[in-house]
């Protein structure tokens, strides 16, 4: 029997630039041209000042582990427990939920404030997800 597939995000016109970026191996964020606020998730206006004058830019892909929970139950198709659901604070300021790869999914390995870098997990020809791994060096 085939293993269940992980849920796929559905790009919208407002988020398409983000998904195009992940397919290109880039983590793209938005910056308000009026107040300089950097934000995620993508939206057509600044959540800080409501300006619609926003720019898209390639983020550094660096951040740190802000928070996480380790799921030990097979609650979601496509995941093998245990797996961490993490909140990563990006160097540019926004926080995003993601998964941590390339390290044990244990409290001993997942230290708060540990430095992380983005990696990309290709699900299919249309969707590539940003995931994070411990930073090298």
Regions found by a protein language model. Give the residues of each.
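A broadly conserved sequence feature marking short terminus-proximal activation segments
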Residues: 1-27, 135-137
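Short nucleic-acid-contacting surface segments enriched for D/E, G, S/T with interspersed K/R
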Residues: 104-117
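Residues immediately within or flanking Cys/His clusters that coordinate Zn2+
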Residues: 26-29, 43
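Beta-strand/loop nucleic-acid-binding surfaces
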Residues: 95-106
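Short functional micro-motifs and their immediate structural scaffolds
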Residues: 40, 53-55
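Conserved hydrophobic positions within beta-strands
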Residues: 63-65, 100
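OB-fold/S1-family single-stranded nucleic acid-binding modules
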Residues: 119-137
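Short, cysteine/histidine-rich loop/knuckle motifs that typically chelate Zn2+
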Residues: 31-34, 45-51
